[in-house]
């Protein structure tokens, strides 16, 4: 096996500019280590022709085959017989062929990389299986000419971006909400938790609520609208439809309609000070009365030009991040997408989790931290559901008691959904009440672009450190040792 010391002479110089790749469910980010922001932010989806379009395309090309996948914002252009498909789900690649083509497109055609001179740092979520990590490693070593690479856990990157080696990373993303303790810059996998009550969960609630409350309204996609006249519901919408000769697929239409729910989420939702679903009836009624006042009314304009007035619903939907069981789906198909989740991960990693020195000394003295009060087996279906505050509180209770106060003082809130107004204020209030013995402190970057790209920025910081050159794992080392051995010895 080649030593890491040999890698230093090759990759340790200042002239080396590593590539940082951060792929998540909603967007993929690519750029250079040391930069403040990624060069490329692209959807983690692609468009491709279906069988009818492929047959017609092959006739035009006289049977010559060429990749027909479309990446970037171009997937939003209507095309006949083209489907839109995701590349990742839960920040994990589900379409390897499309992922490889997407990376090649941006590495070769957009950035025109010189592979021989640039190693790559790849971020990964903490819930990746050993089989997935091995496939990821083999894919990059076998399909690209990078001389070396490094796999970095996303929470670790975020901790570096904030300069907080001991912290709790709360990532409220598109497909999931995850809570991960980071100690000495290393993510503690066994203490991590994840639920699916994230951005897509809100999107589905928004779709369910709007289509049920405004059943007669036409939620037409923007690309179909030729002209429109502004109206306010219940006045009928006034618009003309564009004459489209293209045979638009259902997947493209569904993808475009998600943009409506996404825009609603970003512009209309606001977190209430307290949860609505409470046993205190007078408090619940008082809250509903407050958030039903005219000052809380907002108009949301649809692509058709028709505006919908909403008030209390804006707060009730956002409240479901903290209390997922508070929203009852009208559409059973949407409801089945979100079974009750307590956030506990069944990780089957083949390597031991990181153990801080304090934890080792404590074990030697036969002392133990009392189990968390909510760590017992749930007694009912509802007790299995953990909202945002409950998820964080439970994670804190599983951390070594000597480290708990340090972690509670450094809670990093990140992810695009965390930008919903008043979310951090509500979270601080509930965490302080739930953990009276801890001094809670939240750290949420004010710049929305920075918070949205925080994992990538952390990877950029990490890969540009002067001491990081010894961490790169060369392709030669991979060829000599194999993916499984490298994962166990170098990427623990």
Swiss-Prot record:
SMART domains: ACTIN (SM00268). One of its GO terms (molecular function) is ATP binding. It comes from the Eukaryota. Gene3D superfamilies: 3.30.420.40, Actin, Chain A, domain 4. Coiled coil: none annotated. It is found in: Nucleus. SUPFAM superfamilies: Actin-like ATPase domain. Keywords: Activator, Chromatin regulator, DNA damage, DNA repair, Nucleus, Transcription, Transcription regulation. Its main location: nucleus. CDD domains: ASKHA_NBD_Arp4_ACTL6-like. GO terms for biological process: chromatin remodeling; DNA repair; kinetochore assembly; regulation of transcription by RNA polymerase II. InterPro entries: Actin, Actin_CS, ATPase_NBD. PANTHER family: ACTIN. Belongs to the actin family. ARP4 subfamily. Component of the NuA4 histone acetyltransferase complex, of the INO80 chromatin remodeling complex, and of the SWR1 chromatin remodeling complex. This is Actin-related protein 4.
